[in-house]
């Protein structure tokens, strides 16, 4: 029997000053115990934000509850990268195992609810938010040499892909500038760590680079791409800016 792998999205609030470790029982003590011990901190005292403390758990959501009807909880799920809508009411997460972009309603952060998912044409590596859209990078590479990927523009309200922007390589991370005018995508073109010829060490081509998207106006069809060459900058492996 396949061993199920569970993932959970943890919703936390923050109060300044010291962080206190959570010692109270949680609904998923057991398979989530390690995650909670490592990542969930809870400030001492009440949960109304009046007492000093740090991060504290106010809710969590098991990603298996956001599977499609009829799908088995034995399916492996991953909640890896999370971004929030600009109104703070929706969380968008990447699930690389299922190749999905999931949505969770945190209007009541103590009682999060799944809102479904968008099935993607590749493995999601990162997600960020610009206005009404989630910007999700996906890896569509055939192998470590023949690399490819796309930036998917997803309408958050309708959960639909409204534009696909080819990136020319395997993307890693995505970030939107604070003024909302640019999106930067790191094209990693990661190395094969099991490559016998190199022992998994760099340099391994193709080289990585940076893609900048000019977020012109509110219509994603007007957005444009620029590529920035990053070779020759680093002292170590300058030909391979992975």
Regions from the PLM with identified roles:
Residues 137-147, 186-208:
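Short, conserved, GDST-rich strand-edge loop motifs in beta-rich repeat architectures
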Residues 86-88, 129-131, 176-180:
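Residue-level detector of Asp-centered blade-edge/turn motifs that repeat once per structural unit
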Residues 148-159, 200-218:
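Beta-propeller blade signature
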Residues 108-141, 167-171:
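Blade-loop segments of beta-propeller domains
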Residues 51-73, 119-120, 217-242:
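Surface-exposed loop and turn segments in beta-propeller and other repeat-based domains
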Residues 59-102:
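Beta-strand-rich domains and repeat architectures in extracellular enzymes and scaffolds
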Residues 71-82, 124, 171, 200, ...:
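Signature of short aromatic-glycine-proline-rich micro-motifs recurring in repeat-based ectodomains
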């Amino acid at each position: 029997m396949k061993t199920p792998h569970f993932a959970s999205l943890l919703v936390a609030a923050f109060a300044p000053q010291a962080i206190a470790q959570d010692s109270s029982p949680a609904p998923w003590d057991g398979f989530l115990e390690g995650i909670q011990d490592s990542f969930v901190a809870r400030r001492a005292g009440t949960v109304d934000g009046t007492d000093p403390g740090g991060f504290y758990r106010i809710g969590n959501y098991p990603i298996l509850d956001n599977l499609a009807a009829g799908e088995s909880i034995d399916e492996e799920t991953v909640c890896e990268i999370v971004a929030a809508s600009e109104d703070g009411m929706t969380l968008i997460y990447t699930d690389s195992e299922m190749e999905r972009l999931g949505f969770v309603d945190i209007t009541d952060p103590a009682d999060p609810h799944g809102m479904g998912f968008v099935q993607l044409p590749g493995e999601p590596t990162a997600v960020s938010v610009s206005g009404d859209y989630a910007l999700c990078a996906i890896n569509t590479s055939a192998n470590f040499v023949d690399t490819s990927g796309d930036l998917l523009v997803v309408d958050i309200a309708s959960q639909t892909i409204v534009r696909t922007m080819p990136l020319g390589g395997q993307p890693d991370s995505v970030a939107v500038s604070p003024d909302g005018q640019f999106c930067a995508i790191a094209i990693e073109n990661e190395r094969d760590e099991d490559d016998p010829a190199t022992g998994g060490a760099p340099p391994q081509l193709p080289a990585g680079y940076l893609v900048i998207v000019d977020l012109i106006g509110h219509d994603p069809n007007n957005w444009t791409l620029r590529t920035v060459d990053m070779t020759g900058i680093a002292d170590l492996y300058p030909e391979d800016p992975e």
